Amino acid sequence: MAAMMMRQKVAGAIAGERRSAVAPKMGRAATAPVVVASANASAFKGAAVTARVKASTRAARVQSRRTAVLTQAKIGDSLAEFLVEATPDPKLRHVMMSMAEATRTIAHKVRTASCAGTACVNSFGDEQLAVDMVADKLLFEALKYSHVCKLACSEEVPEPVDMGGEGFCVAFDPLDGSSSSDTNFAVGTIFGVWPGDKLTNITGREQVAAGMGIYGPRTVFCIALKDAPGCHEFLLMDDGKWMHVKETTHIGEGKMFAPGNLRATFDNPAYERLINFYLGEKYTLRYTGGIVPDLFQIIVKEKGVFTNLTSPTTKAKLRILFEVAPLALLIEKAGGASSCDGKAVSALDIPILVCDQRTQICYGSIGEVRRFEEYMYGTSPRFSEKVVA
């Protein structure tokens, strides 16, 4: 019964997309072909010139449509309208609508489902909560009935599962921070979408889209598409629809920090010096312990830095496939930067060889990531300006 309901919801969401989404608005006035010919020109030459002008006109129209697609997404659009304006790929629109539908259902389950443990752990050793498993099932079902997903895997089911569709592969963390759900902290879903038929031997740079659902006082669906500018926030309205409420294209400088794994400062001197810098410069501490709300605040506030570092006695916990790479696409499309894997490189450029590949990470404004790399590695070759501590 649950599977049938999810199939109906996904089908309804896609049908709603077709009904409500309109083609990008643009001038459609026909341009008459111009024939340039002198009195001595032959009919053949006139026809050739006409053909060239027609071809030029068609090319201009195609370019105009492409430009319009990238510029017409606007605040107040529904998610379906935004996707039509942001990407010409109907399969990508379908997979994003399917993830949005699952996010909407998960929001209800987070408010009502059990927070008790299931007395089992996933293959990574993390305790699985009942609400984790509900979210995981909903996302797998949504992807299966989208018919555009080839493979999917999650933090709870890390081995890729054949979804029976074609077009994309999706990796997701169904409910990051779920251990805090009983305290009523914000929790969230993270996902990345890759083209093709594999989820290893890839990089985050190959993602065509990424997103996160944030379940707090408001339910928000935050997404970025590889070929469209900006990072976009959609608010779940009372009527069950997603409304475009914010576009972020720049993350500036501001004294706000979210330092994860502070225990690493005990035996990571460089991290200790960086934290002392933040404290000495009177940065505002804004850390919830959940990477989804902590990253989302950087996008919404358009400033700040998030760090989660390792040390000889505190190992990496964040997984590139399920968390780090999707969040890196969101942050970088919003105008920020990331630094990953103990190297001064973007998290989008780290090869993902296995599903359980883990890393340390920094996200934030370009200036803050540059400072992070200077403190941790002594240099930041990707960025031209040096940090003055």
UniProtKB/Swiss-Prot annotation:
Bound cofactor: record note: Binds 3 Mg(2+) ions per subunit.
Major localization listed first in the record, in broad terms: plastid
EC number: 3.1.3.37
Pathway membership, UniProt: Carbohydrate biosynthesis; Calvin cycle
Localization, UniProt: Plastid, Chloroplast
InterPro entries: FBPase_C_dom, FBPase_class-1, FBPase_N, Fructose_bisphosphatase_AS, SBPase
Xref: Pfam families: FBPase, FBPase_C
MF term (GO), any: metal ion binding
Cystine pairs: C115-C120
Keyword Aminoacyl-tRNA synthetase: no
Record key words, sorted: Calvin cycle, Carbohydrate metabolism, Chloroplast, Disulfide bond, Hydrolase, Magnesium, Metal-binding, Plastid, Transit peptide
Cofactor: Mg(2+)
Catalytic activity: D-sedoheptulose 1,7-bisphosphate + H2O = D-sedoheptulose 7-phosphate + phosphate
Signal sequence coordinates: none
Binding site for Mg(2+) 1: D126, E155
Induction: Light activation through pH changes, Mg(2+) levels and also by light-modulated reduction of essential disulfide groups via the ferredoxin-thioredoxin f system.
A biological-process GO annotation: reductive pentose-phosphate cycle
Residues involved in Mg(2+) 2 binding: E155, D173, L175
Residues that bind substrate: D176, G177, S178, S179, Y287, K317
SUPFAM superfamilies: Carbohydrate phosphatase
Family, per entry: Belongs to the FBPase class 1 family.
Quaternary structure and partners: Homodimer.
Name by which UniProt lists this protein: Sedoheptulose-1,7-bisphosphatase, chloroplastic
Gene name of this polypeptide: CSBP
